[in-house]
């Protein structure tokens, strides 16, 4: 391992979305420490946790249009047919859905599962049920992204959870996304659903650990073994 790789693996970048929160925790720690010294260290523990939460590691993403890559870090919590949210305009027929649940210790940056153009971004208010529940797909607050990929339309839905109360999506309609490119995040535990085209074959199982930008969720049966690249 080179010195550059060692430094990269040791000092994981922090996403800019976390800067205000990290600064806020640090300032509060100073104020609490001024009141009582032990409170400073409690505040610093929370500050370090906030830094950890907003970590944004680089990922090595397979550059192959025949693959669908995980958009989130976490555990595969559901694999099976499900009707997509109406706002995606994918029809009323069930599609194969893969859900990845993120807990509070997961990296919360969301990445595009495919290369393509964003056709639609729709935010829907809703409840904040446990994101592991299946009904969270329809009842919880969510942000639905429709991507036109080389193999057809794919729906990616960011779902708020019991603790997560803030969905962030900085990509817009007509934006072009590369596979593995960051498009948003969800704070403090949540879920991402991927609705696949009919000809996609799922390659993961419930309970499996998924890594955003790296784990292959599905393929189209003609994987060519293209090279991988690091998505910073």
From Swiss-Prot:
One of its GO terms (molecular function) is phosphatidylserine decarboxylase activity. The modification Pyruvic acid (Ser) is found at residue 190. It catalyses: a 1,2-diacyl-sn-glycero-3-phospho-L-serine + H(+) = a 1,2-diacyl-sn-glycero-3-phosphoethanolamine + CO2. Coiled coil: none annotated. The active site is at residue 190. The keyword Lipid metabolism applies. GO terms for biological process: phosphatidylethanolamine biosynthetic process. Its EC number is 4.1.1.65. Disulfide bonds: none annotated. Its main location: membrane. Pfam families: PS_Dcarbxylase. It is found in: Cell membrane. It is a peripheral membrane protein. Catalyzes the formation of phosphatidylethanolamine (PtdEtn) from phosphatidylserine (PtdSer). This is Phosphatidylserine decarboxylase proenzyme. It comes from Brucella anthropi (strain ATCC 49188 / DSM 6882 / CCUG 24695 / JCM 21032 / LMG 3331 / NBRC 15819 / NCTC 12168 / Alc 37) (Ochrobactrum anthropi). The lineage of its organism: Bacteria, Pseudomonadati, Pseudomonadota, Alphaproteobacteria, Hyphomicrobiales.
